């Protein structure tokens, strides 16, 4: 069988053929008239290389062809590309460079195809750089290295022109900068070292000069508008022609020059800085300030400090305003928490609403500003007004909203909203236990004297308080509200009992409210000498109650009772609504016309203070049911009283007020007592788990445990520790008196 021998191609002959193809390619690239490569042309060129590489040695020309491949590029670059670049400058040079780079990539693509066989076998066996890589490195080493400096300067010059507002060819810049990236193949080193570093330095210089002028000439809002616009423009620059990896570095440079360098000068500008923006409610400018300063490291800290100071000043001014208004009150009204204080709480709520909105909207709910707001409110929310603590003021404010006929006339929705806001303010008050006690006293009055406007609101605020302060805070109050519901049921059963035991009917309509001792504030229970009619009522109810339960003891709190009595005056009979104490005193005059002060005290068996209050309400106040000798405005032990039969009034039904005893002192005393117990319990709890602990640490843990309800005084804790030592709960360490041991 005959074999077909392939004709050997020698190097010169083969390369001459290849040269023709390469020249044709160069002509096409230079735009000279030349027909495109046909598939036959391509196959001929490819096959020539293939044959020259697969001939038996010494005619395998792979190594020589690999070198000639490189030389083809070097020759073309030296003869055509570099001269055309060297004769052009600035933008024209950049355009030429883009064209030349584009052509070069086409040339690499075509030549790599012609020489493809080298890539597949020769190169991989010898671990040599691939053809495309060789082609690119020729451009890098010969063209790029020579003109990179001029290119970088031309590009940066155009960028600065654009910064000054001139129109530039962004597409051209994008194409030029793509060369810096593509030259590095997979590495960004060329882009970063030969262009980006210079751009960043130029950017810093450019904005440094701008900032020096603007900080002197512009107001803070105008400066910020310019800074924001610059940052926006630089971001656009990245999107249009810089590499995305430059964005962060570029913006940081701009931020550093425009913001970091001038932060304090900008924030503290006299008539337009942060203080002024807060004072004038410039919310858009404050939002911009937040956006800008949140970009720089620790940039928001000074802003939040100024915000805190501003809110503190505003709140403190409200306290002073309320103090001034209170000091202008008449002396006898100073003790009563009145309308002025209500206005104060309302203003504090409005202040809180305003600055919570600032934190949310201007400062995007950032924790620094939440903290600043909290710390500011803690400063002035714990200042009292004319002897009333903020705990009392808040409790009184709630009372006014929740009681019938309070000074706050609001819709149901507005009431809910306001209560929500009061509970939020409570978070800033350190003496939450004091608020709880005042609130409980006032809740008791609302519930017991049917003053509560709406049960739903009463329960709703307790739910809010529970969420804010925990279940322990509201458990007693919830018990009080529940007691009233149970008491109504008791009353219905009592009325049923009377109707089935008519012989026990006392002849007086009697309503009794049974309360659970632990839930309610403590009240004094005096053994007042009740009139016979009332004694009978008490006995009948006792008998009924014993049919319901055997193990519960009733303690009667007559000081909280009310009574309706008919008083027959000469002109007409008037129904008087009085307290049980007032009724007991008036009923003494059913049998006699005149009674001396001392006789009244003896017959009622009450304290002098109580009797003076009662007599004052009936003989010296608006409705003089009793007349007294001497006829003056104060009660003394030598006075004599008689029923004023001449009394009359246009109404047939009168409520005779009895001014309440000032409960403030009692509330504070009760809270102090509870605090002592709470500190004791906390110390014992801590020591029980720790067994041995130093004084300082015990105090700190105690403060932390109790901080949710009140701020315990260090001296008070020390005192309680001493007391627990004397009661053998703790002992001092023998070697170190500053260390305590728990005694089981």
Curated annotation (Swiss-Prot):
InterPro entries: Cullin (IPR045093), Cullin_CS (IPR016157), Cullin_homology (IPR016158), Cullin_homology_sf (IPR036317), Cullin_N (IPR001373), Cullin_neddylation_domain (IPR019559), Cullin_repeat-like_dom_sf (IPR016159), WH-like_DNA-bd_sf (IPR036388). Belongs to the cullin family. Induction: Induced by abscisic acid, heat shock, salt stress and drought stress. The keyword Chloroplast does not apply. Residues 674-736 form the Cullin neddylation domain. Keywords: Ubl conjugation, Ubl conjugation pathway. Involved in ubiquitination and subsequent proteasomal degradation of target proteins. The keyword Ubl conjugation applies. One of its GO terms (biological process) is protein ubiquitination. This is Cullin-1. GO terms for cellular component: cullin-RING ubiquitin ligase complex. Part of a SCF (SKP1-CUL1-F-box protein) E3 ubiquitin-protein ligase complex. Is able to form the SCF complex together with SKP1 and the rice black streaked dwarf virus RBSDV protein P7-2. Interacts with D3. The lineage of its organism: Eukaryota, Viridiplantae, Streptophyta, Embryophyta, Tracheophyta. Transmembrane segments: none annotated. Neddylated (rubylated). Deneddylation occurs upon interaction with the COP9 signalosome (CSN) complex. Expressed in dry seeds and coleoptiles. One of its GO terms (molecular function) is ubiquitin protein ligase binding. It holds the Pfam family Cullin_Nedd8. It comes from the Eukaryota.
